[in-house]
Amino acid sequence: MKKWIFALPVAATAAAIAANAPGFIVGGPQPGWTLAVTMGYLVCWAVFLRNGTVRWQRIISRIWWIASAVCSAACFCVVTFDLDGFLMIFPALGLVSPLLGIALCVNNHYPLFYGFCTLLAVWYAIGSRPSLKPDTTEEVN
């Protein structure tokens, strides 16, 4: 496995946080360019899950399922109770999971669209993982 693959999600997360920082200062994330950064960020996580070691794939998959529940609850709170400031905690949490990181982009007008994109990314990453069963085939020299 290539060592640089581990740097992809972290670099993508840093880019997403950096791109969103001005938006938070000015008054919330801007949908257009934020969407582009976040989609690239989710693709990096999907590549990592697809090419990482089996052990890391299991660990990250478990984190994703837990994070999806937390993110869903948070998005519900943000949209229902108009808690835009609550999103400020998500850049740091995005280092743990892209499903939490996607909340960088969620605002009152786009939650369903971003949620749909997140589900597509998760479906791709988990559905296209290599088999977790050990390879029993012998290589012929």
Pin down the residues of each PLM region.
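Transmembrane alpha-helical segments in integral membrane proteins
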Residues: C44-W45, Y114-P134
